[in-house]
Amino acid sequence: MSHFARKLYPLASVVLFLFAMSTALRADQKFLSSDDAKEHDEPQKFLPDYDKLVKGKDADWVYFPEGDLKKYKTVLVKEFEHNGKGREAKEAASYGKEYMEQWLQKQGFDVVEKGPADLTVEGNVFNAWEPSGAARVWGGWGANPGVGTELIIKNKSGAIVAEIREKSKGSTVHDAIENGLEDCAKSIAKGK
């Protein structure tokens, strides 16, 4: 074997190994193969395409079939629903519309109260929790209140242009949904 071939063989092996690893890692970034999808107390009934959600940059799980949403300017946000159990889910859903509008405005979208709008956002709270007093004292950040939110974003014709699923924490349920919707708005603005 020539000197050049002996030097090239290890380099080619490393490149092939890295390519194989990157492919394997990308496969693990699908929602349905994640630990998040295995939570039995978190319904998966709101979004039509859970199988297409991939790991997002700001929000946990995203699907943008058309890519980024920069061409859209006006947004109408509907009242949020909740299919999570308990008063916390209902409470979090009541804050959803207000916070979604606030964070979309900060991302440069014009929020309108009535249609027609370029985009319509529909939201759902699939889970919300408030730990008990002892858990808050002993559990640290892991025992903070949290909210699970899902968004469907449609264009004027009613076609889905984005789906997002996010779990977030905060000092209160009120704070947790705001934190989550801030991440969702960033993902909407960036399209990833």
Which residues does each predicted region cover?
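Bacterial N-terminal signal peptides
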Residues: 12-20
